[in-house]
């Protein structure tokens, strides 16, 4: 995959991700010295290209002048190893890349054990997702799974499923040691199978008549409440 932009490339280099090569626009090299130094420390090959040629390869509207070829893919449920107490943030067909990236960033910041992207969710490796995650995907376990596989994993590993639903009460006391908070699609919400498997439905109290919250915002509030109850 390709990581583009000074911040994202530096995050990949600092997180120890396998960066195979860097491409730098010739006119931007002087402004990218910290990135070039980090690449040199890692022994990463750096190629230079004229600005016009670089811009043709870049995906952003205003390219900053650096992109990296990175070997990174989400993990599978078989790769997940949970401690005695662990919280997972699970995305059920969340389709907006900005929401997916924001949720990964939130899960990392709040100390979740992993973010799980169920089938129908935007590709966690897409550039827009990685950019919204602000490098968190390189430091925080991100898993792709079909619902059936995750449900089997949860059952086998004593992971209780909590479903984020509009109009429900916020997380209360009595959090299980292992917990998966599942947030649904921006429009359709959670699939019926998730609701059927959920031990509890939780939500964010809102004023009457208020529009529903953005999926990433609701996830951040609920995950904070869940994690706060663990301390």
Protein language model features and the residues they cover:
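N-terminal positively charged helical leader segments and presequences
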Residues: 1-61
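Amphipathic alpha-helical repeat scaffolds
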Residues: 5, 95-103, 212-218
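RNA substrate-binding interface of SAM-dependent RNA methyltransferases
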Residues: 14, 41, 69, 74-168
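General small-molecule cofactor/ligand-binding pocket signal
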Residues: 45-49, 143, 162, 202
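Structured adenosyl-cofactor binding patch, chiefly the S-adenosyl-L-methionine
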Residues: 68, 106-110, 119-136, 192-231
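Active-site/ligand-binding-proximal alpha/beta "capping" segment
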Residues: 162-210, 214
